Amino acid sequence: MDFTGKRVGVIGTGATAIQAIPEIAKQAAHLTIFQRRPNWAAPLHNAPIGKAEMEEIKTRYEEIHARCAETPSWFIHEADRRRTMDVPPEERAAFWEKLYAEPGFGIWMGNFRDILTDETANAAISAFIAGKIRQRVKDPKVADKLIPKDHGFGTRRVPLESGYFETFNRDNVTLVDVINDEPIECITPEGVRTARRDHACDILIYATGFDGVTGAFDRIDIRGPGGVRLKDVWADGPRTCLGLQPDGFPNLLMVLGPHTARGNIPRAIEHGVEWHTGLLRFMRAHNLTRVETRPEQVAEWTETVIKASEALLSSKVDSWQTGVNRNVEGRTVRRVLGYNGNGMHYRRKCEEVAAGGYREFAFR
């Protein structure tokens, strides 16, 4: 879409908006950003890849994939096992500067391990990132509005950005705080009306998120024997065996379903496809046409998933990863949606089930 000469409004400052806003601002006559709550974000540091570099990367494909299979989050990054506050302040700051300057999720996934479990450690990394935002945004008041106050760095999924914070230094960009300053009253034919004024918009973009993890399953209206709806069974939270199948829904196999290990999504999908392929080959070899996970296995794995999340600071934060989405009716109570334990342990558990002849499942 061409935004040249247009007055554009964006509602939301989550991952989608953080990616779109810098590009829209380059074209628009004016961009108004309506922010409910700010999110932490870190530099993506994407750059063009030359032919020689691409050829070198191709020679390491197997090495890269093997590395991703060996880390807890299925990324090439692995957390530093030192405790944050045990590291001298100067060394800690240098380490964070290095991570902040590198491409990818290193600042989140390759950081000190306890930033996701220890409040003091998390406060320290949050202060570091807040300092970076203040350095990059010229107006101190705007910078302060862009710094989250309701959650620490890494306790929600961290969006990666390219020039997002610098965008707010542009003369054609306005940030509207719809929680503390200008609540949105209504959308008008001319734009957005807040409690203070009308904001003219030729184009209005809703970057308000999505119903993560279980939302796609709910929208399909999946039903089991007797017309039982999966959405109703999961009303208080999903229940699955290894995130691969819920009980009571024969032949419903899920790739990247609730309660799978979280982290590098493409690698997790790859693992799920490979595992299900093995299961289907097993069924074909034994002339089986129906598979259903055993209820006791679902209960056991669901309890494992819940316990794995208890030590994480993210379990105390409202986010789509904990099942809270106030744009969706009924999504106001936290639920454990993913396995937040070690991805390698999850992979081994799945492999053990397959190697044992899938005893956790009943076949016909």
Name what the model sees in each region:
Residues 1-5, 13, 28-364:
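N-terminal FAD-binding dinucleotide-binding subdomain shared by FAD-dependent oxidases/monooxygenases
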Residues 16:
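Hydrophobic/small residue at the entry helix of a nucleotide-binding pocket
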Residues 20-24:
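Aromatic pocket-lining residues of Rossmann-like dinucleotide-binding sites
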